[in-house]
Amino acid sequence: QGVADGLAGLARLQWDERHFVESGGHLLFTRGDYELHLADIAFVKVGAVSGADDLYASELYGNRDFVCSSTVRSGTTRRMLWCEAGEPPPAVLLPHRERLITRRIRPFDESNWWHWGRGYHQSALPRVYVNSKTRSARPFFCHPCPNYDGSVLAIFPHDPLLAVQQLADALNSVDWTDLGFVCDGRFLFTQRSLEQSPLPGPLRALLPARSVQ
C-alpha cells in the first residue's frame, strides 16, 4: 500500500521538463533548448582597471573618455587619465607615487608605478557593452566610445559587418534568468561565463557567413 501511494503521489506531481546543459564547465538545467554559444558569434573582453579611480578620474587632467557602469543609464562616459606604455609618469600623479606603487592589483615598481592595474583590448571595431553587474532591464547596449573600464564587458562580433545594435537587441531578448545569470533581480556576467553562454536558435542568423549551416 505504501508503494502504491508513493507511485500515485508521483503521478500527481507537476513535472517541469528541463534540459541538462554543460557549457564551458558550467552545468545548467534550462527550460529552453539552446543550439549555439555566444562564442560562436563574438568574443568578450574585460575593461581597464586603474586600481585608484579617485586619482585617475578627472575632467581636468583626463585624456580619454571611458564607458563605465553608469553609461547604460545615462549615456555619458567618464573622463580618465590614461597612461600608455612607454610614456613618462604624468606630473599630476607624482605626489601619489607611494600609494600607487603599493596597489595590489598587480606588481608595480619604479618602471611602471603610474600605469593602470589592468589594460583593455584597444580596438576600433564595433562592439556591444554590458555591465558585469546590473539591474537594467535591457543590459546590453551600444556606445561610440571605444574605451571601457573594469565594470564593463565588451562583446566584439566575429563578423565585423554585423550591426552591433542588432546584436545588442538580440542579446536583450535572451532569457538570461533561465541561463542562470540573474540573482535577486540583478544580472551577473563574467567574461568566461558570458562567452561560453548557450544561446537560442534564432540567434543563428548572427553567425559569421562561413559558420552558418
Where are these regions (language model features)?
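C-terminal substrate-recognition regions of SAM-dependent nucleic acid methyltransferases
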Residues: 1-129, 135, 165-213
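A short beta-sheet element
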Residues: 132-167
